[in-house]
Amino acid sequence: MSLRNERLNQILTEARPKIARHWSLYDGGFGHGGTAAAVAGVDELLVGYFGKLKDMPDGTPATTILHEIEMLLRGLAEVNASCGGAYLETDERDLLVPIIIEAATVAGLDANEFKDADPTLQFRAKLLIL
């Protein structure tokens, strides 16, 4: 396994308990307005995102990595909509966006090329998510 993929595995392994702990702070352990399906959906989307990044060869163009960020955020927007639009908000942004950016950076994206070093911002603004 490449060092890049080892690092991606490490990021996800460290993130999953933090995310689970976050959901546990809310009634029923699902987050505000969420369901077990929503929690599972977020987890599935994150695992899929990391899998896509790990499948990319070294030197993958930034546009390809950005596409995966956009697809992840579109999926998260769908999960949020399924919960009345109030499931993924500020606290979740503060939790998930750094994980998304760190993974993209490890995959080869230079986050410093984006406003506030946040390559998710353009998609979050368009999708009204996080």
Where are these regions (language model features)?
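Generic alpha-helix signal with a bias toward terminal, lower-confidence helices
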Residues: S24, P57-D58, A77, L88, ...
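Residue-level recognition of alpha-helical structural elements
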Residues: A38, P61-I65, G85-E92
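Mature extracytoplasmic domains of secretory-pathway proteins
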Residues: L53-N80
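Amphipathic alpha-helical binding modules
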Residues: G84-L130
